[in-house]
A protein has these predicted regions:
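Conserved phosphate-binding catalytic cores of ATP/NTP-utilizing and phosphoryl-transfer enzymes
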Residues: 1-2, 112-133, 310
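N-terminal beta-alpha supersecondary unit
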Residues: 4-75, 81-85, 114, 118
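Short beta-strand scaffold segments in enzyme catalytic cores
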Residues: 16-21, 134, 142-146
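A contiguous, well-structured pocket-lining segment that forms one wall/lid of small-molecule binding clefts
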Residues: 72, 187-265, 274-288, 315-318, ...
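Short glycine-rich phosphate-binding loop at a beta-alpha junction
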Residues: 73-83, 261-271, 293
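Conserved phosphate-binding/catalytic loops in two-lobed NTP-binding clefts
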Residues: 111-112, 265, 282-306
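Glycine-rich phosphate-binding/hydrolytic loop that grips phosphoryl groups
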Residues: 119, 295-335
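Glycine-rich phosphate-binding loop plus the immediately following alpha-helix
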Residues: 138, 149-191, 215-224
């Protein structure tokens, strides 16, 4: 069988990335240009700044990826790009670059949902087994998704307010920690102990999540301690917060696994790089004889390799797009789409 090479582009937020992926599983070459140092100056991602930096870097990232691979664009079987969801201005840069490559080199064009990319990052270097439950945890999403087979998605739970990564960032700001908040909260939590009471997260029997309550609890806790001029034990707050969040993710995931009677589980998204949360979910699977699939940490945060992995599934299904595709800031995965 002929090897399939897909050139993929990712620009949904604050990383400009390009990758060449073979057969949806082998990372031939990947380049990532991160904007973290720039956005750190503003305390978070500024959409207008992000899109301008994507414009400055997209050509360099594409050229560097081709150079590292030793291949030519003519060797590619398709061009793929993240078209949704994400920051609209950022998405547009990647989409237009991919359209241009598709047109100039006469290659099939594949639009990829960003969340599909995160989930199928688990295909890189390993073979997913179905049916499965996937937990997608990132700055914009906290979703439980049932996949009966490759390329089918059914939402069974989601956040009702803040996404888990967003909550980490907001708690980091409450604790006067710099951007990016999530990794800094995780680092601080390692220095603390779980000594502070945190409220149960949406214990309603559903598979949905809600993080606004624990965020408000931490905010009120810190505010009241400041008012009373008490010493604020930031490591213990971070540790207690992180433990509470991890427990909620474990409880909801396990409930979904049992409900759908599956033996396979994946985690995906940027928050999946959090070591404590990873270990909590790994232990859950060990204790319940569930096979867990986890991407390498470098494939958890935004990258084009995961887009190439997802595009391969669409390639096999013949799901190509015309060049009239537009970027969209909000578009969900659906069974009907695939």
């Amino acid at each position: 069988m002929k090897d399939i090479y897909i050139f993929a582009i990712e620009s949904s937020c604050d990383e400009t990335s390009a990758s060449i992926v073979k057969n949806g599983k082998v990372d031939i070459a990947t380049t990532i240009n991160t904007q973290i140092d720039t956005h750190k100056l503003y305390g978070g991602v500024v959409p207008e700044v992000a899109s301008r930096l994507h414009l400055e870097n997209i050509t360099l990232v594409i050229d560097e990826t081709i150079k590292k691979s030793g291949m030519k664009m003519e060797d590619m079987d398709a061009i793929a790009v993240t078209y949704s969801p994400g920051l609209l201005g950022s998405l547009l840069v990647g989409v237009e670059a991919a359209k241009t490559l598709s047109l100039v080199y006469n290659k099939p064009f594949i639009k990829v949902n960003h969340m599909m990319g995160h989930i199928l990052a688990n295909n890189i270097g390993q073979d997913l087994e179905y049916p499965l439950i996937s937990l997608v945890i990132s700055g914009g999403h906290t979703d439980l998704i049932y996949m009966e087979n490759e390329g089918t998605f059914k939402y069974i739970g989601r956040t009702l307010d803040d996404a888990v990564g967003e909550c980490f960032d907001k708690v980091a700001r409450i604790l006067d920690m710099p951007y990016p908040g999530g990794p800094n909260v995780e680092k601080l939590a390692k220095e603390g102990k779980c000594t502070i009471h945190m409220p149960k997260i949406l214990d309603d029997g559903s598979y949905n999540f809600s993080f606004s309550g624990i965020k408000s609890h931490v905010n009120n806790l810190v505010h009241n301690m400041k008012q009373r001029k008490e010493e604020i034990n930031k490591p213990d707050i971070a540790c207690s917060f992180q433990t509470c969040v991890a427990n909620s993710l474990v409880e909801k995931s396990l409930a979904a696994i049992k409900k759908y009677n599956v033996k396979n589980f994946t985690i995906a998204g940027g928050v999946a790089s959090n070591s404590y949360i990873r270990e909590s979910l790994i232990n859950m699977c060990k204790e319940n004889n569930i096979k867990i699939f986890i991407p390498d940490k470098k494939y958890c945060t935004d990258n084009a390799t995961m887009i190439g992995a997802a595009a391969y599934v669409l390639y096999k299904k013949g799901m190509f797009s015309d060049l009239n595709v537009n970027a969209s800031s909000h578009e969900e995965l659906s069974l009907e789409e695939l």
